[in-house]
């Protein structure tokens, strides 16, 4: 009881901060970016679904694309796929299990952190990744914005 | 011979991959999937098995883990940007356990262009829509793919090659795929006597959007041999030639050897926000009475609510009942041939499934790659159409029946 008395205000603050940060983060916009030297200027949603859902493996100009998934940021990954196809990550994993374990398609390449994604985008002209808008650098090119 | 060569390929490639793994870790990916599932049924007579390849079954008063539990490991090795090796090894209940039998896939995949792809080696069978992933339970909402459609698909993989072409359009993508190869049936007896399928040709056309898809598939193949029981019955029928002029011709109809078999299916699915409606109709026939024309299908309605999926599934298999006296009035039935007549009817009935199932189920995604599933089924089996169920005795002695089966499963991927 005493424990609850002392810690309930603290708990409330933590929860409030958590809620605020969650809301703040969930409100942050996601953009899809490529290497700055990539010829592609813009992609439509169907093109991004094709690339990230294993339906087609090239940009509209015919060049091979390498979609990148982020491993250690479920918040960003979940928000991206929810915006893209309206599915939670578990259903996206189920979808990809069918493609991968039938041997039809190679899944997106995986980078661990945002820093890794950033580095990959700088090094690989075929790379295509999703990042928070605030994370875009002058070495990335935005090809799609989610509303 | 085919089996031996693919065992060697699988072993060599796996060895190379393991060695390469130390040198180029990022080029090798190890992943996998599995199911831990149990089933229990209220019938000793018509026991559950997920497909005809299984000797293990679920029956009254017990929990059976073997029919549905399995684990699979997949190795993906990128030789270059365009060339990959894929090896998949699945351990599940089956008659033989060796490198060949657990190697579900072992092939090279080459992307000629983004539109054209070729694969060669051991490939997952792509006969009906879920044939190539029927063991990957995490990939679909149900505990298992509908037995009425997939229980009769004769193999999980074939050896050969395929070529596919993909063309994106504004609202959908077109995928055309052709396969040529050969393989062996999973169907077997206690003596392990599979049927070999030669000259197996398959064509598939799919129209795929994210909200809907439509797929048409057709496969044609020639059976190279009979299993032992079938061979004995066909030979015995041929010996009736002195008493019945049609005996030799009919013996050829009884036999599966050199018979052309056709598998055709149409699949669709459509998402309406949280709802998904999907279904498949398939048709199988051959010119042998051992595999007579059969309609099979399922219709599924799923509702996605957060991490939960609730579904209702109706599936059926329909083949006409076979009576020798009606189909072959000239067949001499007397005291000495009565038993042979029963065996002929058994041959004509054991793959002639006639049953329907209504299933209700719930899938709960505990994590991104872990799902808990419960499924309850009511199956109505028709007399002489009970071949999909495991049982003692002959199919021709079976009568109409109703069976309830409960499944509980954990499906995962890694």
Q: Which residues make up each language-model segment?
A:
Chain B
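Bacterial N-terminal signal peptides
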Residues: 9-17
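Transmembrane beta-strand segments of Gram-negative outer membrane beta-barrel proteins
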Residues: 24-52, 404-406
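Sec/Tat signal peptide C-region and signal peptidase I cleavage site
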Residues: 17-24
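Outer-membrane beta-barrel pore domains
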Residues: 43-45, 107, 235-414
């Amino acid at each position: 009881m005493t424990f609850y008395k002392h810690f309930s205000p603290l708990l409330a603050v933590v929860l409030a901060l958590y809620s605020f940060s969650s809301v703040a983060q969930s409100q942050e916009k996601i953009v899809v970016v490529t290497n700055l030297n990539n010829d592609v200027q813009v992609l439509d949603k169907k093109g991004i679904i094709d690339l990230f859902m294993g339906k087609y493996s090239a940009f509209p100009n015919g060049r091979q694309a390498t979609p990148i998934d982020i491993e250690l940021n479920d918040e960003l990954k979940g928000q991206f796929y929810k915006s893209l196809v309206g599915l939670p990550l578990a259903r996206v994993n189920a979808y990809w299990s069918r493609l991968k374990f039938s041997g039809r398609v190679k899944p997106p390449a995986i980078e661990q952190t945002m820093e890794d994604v950033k580095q990959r985008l700088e090094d690989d002209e075929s790379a295509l990744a999703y990042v928070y808008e605030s994370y875009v650098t002058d070495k990335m090119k935005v090809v799609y914005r989610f509303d | 011979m085919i089996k031996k060569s693919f065992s060697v390929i699988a072993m060599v490639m796996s060895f190379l991959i393991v060695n390469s793994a130390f040198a180029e870790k990022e080029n090798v990916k190890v992943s996998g999937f599995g199911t831990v599932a149990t089933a229990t049924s209220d019938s000793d007579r018509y026991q559950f098995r997920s497909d005809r390849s299984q000797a293990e079954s679920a029956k009254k008063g017990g929990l059976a883990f073997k029919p549905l539990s399995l684990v699979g490991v997949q190795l993906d090795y990128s030789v270059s940007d365009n060339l990959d090796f894929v090896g998949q090894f699945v351990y599940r209940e089956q008659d033989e356990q060796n490198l060949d039998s657990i190697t579900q896939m072992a092939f090279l995949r080459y992307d000629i262009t983004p539109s054209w792809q070729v694969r060669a080696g051991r490939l997952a069978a792509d006969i009906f829509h879920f044939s190539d992933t029927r063991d990957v339970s995490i990939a679909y909402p149900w505990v298992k793919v509908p037995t009425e459609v997939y229980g009769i698909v004769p193999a999980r993989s074939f050896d050969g090659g395929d070529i596919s072409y993909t063309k994106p359009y504004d609202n959908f993508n077109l995928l055309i795929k052709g396969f040529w190869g050969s393989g062996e049936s999973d169907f077997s007896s206690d003596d392990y006597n599979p049927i070999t399928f030669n000259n197996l040709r398959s064509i598939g056309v799919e129209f795929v959007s994210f909200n809907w898809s439509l797929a048409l598939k057709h496969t044609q193949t020639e059976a190279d041999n009979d299993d032992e029981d079938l061979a004995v019955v066909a030979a015995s029928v041929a010996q009736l030639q002195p008493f019945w002029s049609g005996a030799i011709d009919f013996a050829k109809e009884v036999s599966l050897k050199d018979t052309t078999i056709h598998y055709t299916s149409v699949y669709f699915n459509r998402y309406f926000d949280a709802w998904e409606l999907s279904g498949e109709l398939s048709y199988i026939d051959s010119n042998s009475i051992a595999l007579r024309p059969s309609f099979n299908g399922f219709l599924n309605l799923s509702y996605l609510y957060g991490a939960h999926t609730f579904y209702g599934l109706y599936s059926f298999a329909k083949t006409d009942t076979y009576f020798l006296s009606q189909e072959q009035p000239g067949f001499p039935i007397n005291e000495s041939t009565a038993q042979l007549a029963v065996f002929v009817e058994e041959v004509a009935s054991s793959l002639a499934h006639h049953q329907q199932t209504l299933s209700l189920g719930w899938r709960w995604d505990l994590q991104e790659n872990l799902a808990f599933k419960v499924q309850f089924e009511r199956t109505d089996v028709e007399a002489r159409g009970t071949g999909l169920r495991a049982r003692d005795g002959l199919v021709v002695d079976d009568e109409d029946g109703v069976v309830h089966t409960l499944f509980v499963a954990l499906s995962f991927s890694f």
